[in-house]
């Protein structure tokens, strides 16, 4: 969709790939994170000259690398991707692929080759291979990160066997999991060439590979985390967690004293002349990796009992894959635990490639979708959207272009359609209320409250609800302000995952590795309101995509990549720049006030913030003050506790019980009362049970404590009832009419086991199982109640029923 920054173009860029992680360290040439040197050209067919591109690269190999053509092997092939296809040429020397030129010529999306209008030269060259080839080191890792490899050799006391590596490396490519059918056979072939048996060769190479993998993975993690990505259990972050845990597994397996954040620091220092930005956020990278290390250790702890059960069964590749994907338990850990039980586990050589392939199929999609689709002729012109210019909602005139039932298309409109997580505008078109607005293709569709009487071609007067527009614009601009504030407070890794803006409140999902503390929330809110107070100008403009990316980087894509050649850029001066099509204020001061009302960790690497701005913030403030005082008084009265009740914690406390803030006082009272009643029940049953509420310091902590106490009581009562029911079963037979010392739950538990039964306790509560006719006889004796298979209720005269009722 966009023009290249230059034509022809040579561009180096750091890339990550995860489909052959198992090769890293083994072949001496593979990386999860590497610099790709791209050579590109975009030409009309008449200007497309494959011979020239081939000769240009051959000249570079001759003069740049000093390679004589007799030492270069050219392998012809074909390459396809993205619906395009073309011949390719791989350049090899001494068994190593140095580069690959692809000559894209055909569009194959239809299933048949079709000549491209623009033909493309697409050459890729792994940068790390060139210095390795020219310097003649044992592997490319020594040349790519010498300081880190040197440090690891010192920490691990592992010295390279140069003679062995010199013999092994020419055949290491035979172990490439992408190209080998049977890895075990490949190891045997390599071992025979080296002059060793597999049992001698493999442990030595794998130990070296572990050292190289730790060096490589730590660099890949440094680049990606510095770029704003987080290890997690979903999406692309899953692959980063795989890298981290693979490195940690090697460290644990060989009992090495290696710290990954320290290696990242060494990488950053070595790369500073080329990538100075890697040294700017090292504290943040360290914190993120330390959190990952805690999660890793937690997984190892819980893994012991899980693996202990699993290894008793047949453990195959699918079992290992499922354990890693669902529990985060690595195959190395399974193998380690299995060995303690004298069980041998075989780990597939391509295990991590299979993990990566599994997660390529999983993706998160954030979009605004309308179920309604109306039929509009293509001749109807595109709607001219006027809402981009100014958030103030004016009265305007427009021509009716098309009408379908209650759906109206105008030649131009100020009405914003539901999109980008922001709700639509409302207002009027003529005498009709606009109840919905949505985008369909090139048109903006207005739904009115009745089939209109005006006709196509009529000029109508329309007006947008200005109060609704203002509130939505405040919430949308607040999203950008909070995103920027969170990044300043929490770190450079903060990005927007998704957002929603309604009339009542807004929400933004930010990428972060842990729950936010009250201190952090206060700091973010304070920073957001400081941005408001500065009255910063908010510039809105349409810019070609390539210019927007060049000026502001790809960070403009918050919450997803915006489509189109032209991007609408919303620029809050020196604060935040995003590609966004929503309605936005003209200055930050117009947002007036922001209050963050709740925070929740909704995914492993995502935190959701809910907030209000403008009038909604002021109304929420008044409501929360009243509610806070009410709840503080309630807690003092019922529990004799003086608890900290802040307005923001109201929502978090309500979330504990899955109720609204308005329902929270009654819910708290109900749960506390139930706890007290349960304590009485325990005493009546002669059971000792007492759960004392902790001296919680916040409303959320107390709410969680109350909920946990209630839940624990419920479980304990169920156990007691089951025990009592089991004890009293000996008094009960089929067709019995029996009085038992048990509550209704226990009576039901016993009755389930019979076809015909009537059980009554001393309070007259009964449970009945039998026919409709038999139940009618019970009703004649004064029973009141009902049900389906099991009927329950109460009788007034227990003795009368026991004496008179029979099956």
Write out the residue ranges for each language-model feature:
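Structured aminoacyl-transfer and RNA-binding surfaces used for tRNA recognition/handling
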Residues: 1-233, 237-241, 251-264, 577, ...
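Conserved nucleotide-binding/hydrolysis modules and their immediate coupling elements
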Residues: 362-463, 467
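Conserved catalytic alpha/beta cores of large enzymes that bind or transform nucleotide phosphates
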Residues: 119-131, 138, 153, 157-187, ...
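Extended, domain-scale alpha-helical bundle/helix-rich regions
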Residues: 250-256, 288-375
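Terminal appendage regions of diverse proteins
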Residues: 254, 320-326, 337, 493, ...
């Amino acid at each position: 969709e966009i023009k290249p920054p230059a034509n022809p173009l040579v561009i180096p860029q750091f890339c990550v790939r995860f489909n052959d992680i198992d090769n890293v360290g083994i072949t001496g040439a593979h990386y999860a994170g590497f610099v790709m040197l791209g050579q590109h050209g975009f030409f009309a067919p008449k200007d497309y000259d494959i011979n020239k591109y081939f000769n240009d690269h051959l000249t570079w190999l001759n003069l740049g690398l000093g390679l004589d053509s007799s030492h270069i092997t050219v392998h012809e092939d074909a390459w396809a991707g993205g619906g395009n296809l073309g011949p390719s040429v791989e350049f090899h020397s001494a068994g190593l692929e140095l580069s690959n030129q692809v000559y894209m010529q055909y569009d194959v999306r239809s299933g048949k080759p079709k000549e491209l209008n623009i033909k493309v030269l697409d050459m890729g060259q792994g940068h790390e291979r060139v210095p390795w080839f020219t310097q003649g080191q044992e592997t490319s890792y020594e040349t790519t990160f010498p300081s880190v490899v040197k440090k690891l050799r010192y920490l691990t006391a592992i010295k390279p066997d140069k003679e062995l590596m010199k013999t092994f490396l020419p055949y290491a490519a035979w172990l490439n999991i992408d190209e080998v059918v049977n890895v075990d056979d490949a190891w045997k072939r390599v071992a025979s060439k080296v002059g060793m048996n597999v049992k001698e060769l493999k442990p030595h190479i794998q130990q070296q590979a572990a050292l190289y993998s730790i060096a490589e993975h730590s660099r890949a993690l440094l680049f990606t985390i510095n770029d704003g990505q987080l290890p997690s259990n979903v999406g692309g972050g899953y692959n980063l967690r795989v890298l981290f845990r693979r490195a940690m597994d090697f460290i644990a397996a060989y009992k090495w004293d290696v710290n990954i954040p320290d290696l990242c620091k060494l990488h950053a220092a070595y790369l500073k002349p080329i990538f100075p930005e890697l040294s700017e956020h090292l504290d943040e990278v360290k914190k993120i990796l330390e959190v990952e290390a805690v999660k890793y250790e937690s997984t190892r702890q819980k893994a012991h009992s899980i693996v202990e059960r699993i290894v008793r069964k047949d453990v195959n590749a699918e079992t290992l894959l499922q354990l890693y994907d669902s529990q985060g338990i690595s195959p190395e850990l399974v193998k380690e635990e299995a060995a303690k039980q004298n069980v041998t586990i075989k780990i597939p050589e391509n295990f991590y490639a299979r993990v990566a392939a599994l997660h390529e199929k999983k993706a998160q999609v954030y979009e605004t979708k309308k179920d309604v689709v109306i039929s509009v002729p293509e001749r109807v012109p595109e709607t001219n959207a006027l809402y981009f210019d100014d958030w103030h909602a004016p009265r305007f005139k427009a021509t009716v272009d098309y009408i379908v039932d209650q759906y109206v298309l105008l030649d131009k409109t100020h009405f914003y359609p539901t999109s980008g997580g922001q709700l639509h505008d409302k207002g009027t078109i003529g005498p009709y209320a606009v109840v919905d607005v949505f985008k369909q293709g090139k048109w903006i569709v207005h739904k009115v409250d009745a089939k209109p009487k005006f006709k196509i071609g009529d000029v109508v007067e329309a007006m947008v609800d200005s109060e609704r527009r203002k509130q939505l614009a405040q919430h949308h601009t607040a999203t950008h302000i909070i995103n920027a504030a969170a990044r300043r407070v929490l770190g450079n890794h903060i990005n927007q995952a998704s957002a929603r803006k309604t009339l009542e409140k807004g929400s933004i999902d930010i990428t972060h590795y842990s729950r936010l503390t009250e201190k952090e929330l206060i700091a973010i809110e304070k920073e957001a309101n400081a941005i408001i107070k500065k009255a910063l100008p908010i510039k809105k403009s349409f810019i070609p995509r390539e210019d927007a990316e060049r000026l502001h980087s790809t960070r403009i894509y918050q919450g997803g990549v915006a489509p189109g050649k032209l991007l609408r850029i919303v620029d809050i001066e020196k604060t935040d720049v995003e590609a966004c099509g929503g309605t936005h204020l003209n200055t930050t001061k117009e947002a007036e006030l922001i209050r963050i009302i709740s925070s929740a960790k909704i995914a492993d690497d995502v935190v959701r913030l809910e907030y209000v701005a403008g009038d909604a913030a002021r109304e929420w403030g008044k409501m929360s003050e009243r509610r806070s005082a009410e709840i503080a008084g309630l807690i003092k009265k019922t529990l004799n506790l003086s608890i900290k009740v802040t307005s923001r914690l109201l929502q978090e406390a309500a979330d504990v019980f899955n109720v609204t803030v308005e329902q929270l006082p009654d819910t708290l009272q109900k749960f506390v009362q139930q706890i007290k009643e349960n304590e009485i029940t325990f005493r009546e049953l002669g059971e000792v049970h007492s759960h004392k509420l902790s001296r919680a310091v916040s409303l959320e902590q107390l709410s969680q404590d109350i909920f946990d106490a209630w839940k624990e009581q419920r479980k304990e009562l169920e156990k007691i009832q089951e025990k009592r029911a089991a004890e009293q079963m000996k008094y009960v037979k089929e067709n019995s009419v029996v009085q038992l010392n048990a509550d209704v739950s226990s009576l039901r538990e016993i009755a389930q086991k019979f076809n015909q039964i009537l059980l009554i306790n001393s309070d007259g509560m009964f449970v009945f199982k039998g026919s409709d006719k038999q139940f009618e006889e019970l009703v004649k004796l004064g029973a009141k109640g009902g049900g389906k298979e099991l009927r329950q209720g109460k009788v007034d005269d227990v003795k009368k029923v026991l004496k008179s009722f029979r099956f």
